[in-house]
From Swiss-Prot:
This is Ribonuclease HII. It comes from Pectobacterium carotovorum subsp. carotovorum (strain PC1). Transmembrane segments: none annotated. Its cofactor is Mn(2+); Mg(2+). It comes from the Bacteria. PANTHER family: RIBONUCLEASE H2 SUBUNIT A (PTHR10954), RIBONUCLEASE HII (PTHR10954:SF18).
Amino acid sequence: MSEIFIYPQATCIAGVDEVGRGPLVGAVVTAAVILDPTRPIVGLADSKQLSEKRRLALYDEIKEKALAWSLGRAEPEEIDQLNILHATMLAMQRAVAGLAVVPDFVLIDGNRCPALPMPSQAVVKGDSRVAEISAASIMAKVTRDREMVELDERFPAYGFAQHKGYPTAFHLEKLAALGATEFHRRSFAPVKRALGLA
């Protein structure tokens, strides 16, 4: 169990997390969530620790009960142009900007914060320590996983539905044999190699 997180003094807190920094294909997806203290959601945890069935149930519950939630993203072209870190920060800014309720404080999973118009704090292992960040991690993961299933339907040979774009042995093998799709991140070394650019 990770240490207890001490919340900042604020009345409206948003949690932010990202999914998809490591994959070779697709967008990096972020979510920002403001929970409603009068409508608690039981069982929020880091999305990676939950079964897919539980994640999907919580995703629906968060959509229904949260005061506000928003998704952000940075596309492969932006990742290639900016680099993955800066693209992730941009996607986080987009998620926060999309909230229908403006938070007075933002808690972000990880060790750095994007520039935001309100105070923010980075929380290491926040997805398992802060309910708002756990909720954001679930929203982002379910969204990105669904996008990978859709991409799998367009490009069935690559196995995107299984590995979600991460550089598994199978994915690397298919990348070498078939080349890159238009959705692959060209700045990532295995994709560069497949395109003969490395």
